[in-house]
Amino acid sequence: MEYDDLLNMGTELGYQLMFSGAEIYRVEESVYRLLTAYGLQPQVFAIPNCLIVSLNTPQGHPITRMRRIPSHGTLSLIHI
């Protein structure tokens, strides 16, 4: 599998988990485990509205994906 495809798959996994309300540590760990299963050494950073996944190819080229997470089912204080 190509590195871009693996990175996109990991980013999509993290996006779906975050959008579904998963805890941040679970998102980071799941994406990390998925990509390390393919022999990669990823760096994963997640905050409630953003996911960043990065890795270096064996040739030393960095590849990074960032995905913004729109507001997703959190409590809105405007309606209280």
Indicate where each model-derived feature is located.
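Divalent-cation
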Residues: 22-48, 66
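Polyanion/phosphate-binding surface patch
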Residues: 50-54
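Short Lys/Arg-enriched alpha/beta "domain-start" segment
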Residues: 4, 8-10, 14-22
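Conserved small/polar residues in nucleotide/adenosyl-binding loops
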Residues: 78-80
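Active-site cofactor/substrate anionic-group-binding motifs, chiefly glycine-
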Residues: 62-74
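Short acidic-glycine loop/turn motifs at beta-strand connectors
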Residues: 56-61
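Ordered, soluble secondary-structure elements with a strong preference for glycine-centered loop motifs
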Residues: 21-22, 72, 76
